[in-house]
């Protein structure tokens, strides 16, 4: 059974500023502070930023994901943008699902695996994505 299908498109930009030109208030960016401070902070982008390390370190856990979900549950976003390594990307993939309010519900398939948001990934380490 095929749960979902990814349609990949590769793009190239000269800088993060060029990449971010089309970001809107409906974008949710999940990243790390060590990337945000030098590359994103000065751009004054209208989107919501989540700094993954503020919710825990290491591999993503149900607890980490649920804390982030609790902070953004009332926000409307149409696109999830992951800028970072494996943890950031894994969390971002989950946040594209329709109706997700609890990580365990998604992992146990208590909610339909239905994509509701576009996913954009900017991997920052080799082997991620």
Regions found by a protein language model. Give the residues of each.
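Glycine/threonine-rich beta-strand-loop-alpha-helix active-site module
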Residues: 60-129
């Amino acid at each position: 059974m095929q749960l979902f299908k990814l349609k990949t498109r590769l793009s190239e930009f000269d800088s993060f500023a060029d990449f971010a030109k089309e970001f809107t208030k409906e974008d949710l960016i999940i990243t790390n502070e060590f990337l945000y401070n030098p590359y994103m902070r000065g751009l004054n982008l209208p989107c919501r930023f989540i700094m993954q390390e503020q919710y825990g370190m290491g591999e993503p856990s149900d607890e980490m994901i649920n804390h982030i979900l609790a902070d953004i549950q009332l926000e409307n976003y149409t696109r999830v943008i992951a800028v970072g390594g494996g943890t950031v990307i894994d969390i971002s993939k989950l946040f594209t699902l329709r109706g997700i309010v609890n990580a365990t519900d998604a992992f146990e398939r208590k909610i339909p695996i239905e994509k509701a948001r576009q996913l954009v990934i900017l991997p920052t380490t080799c082997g991620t994505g």
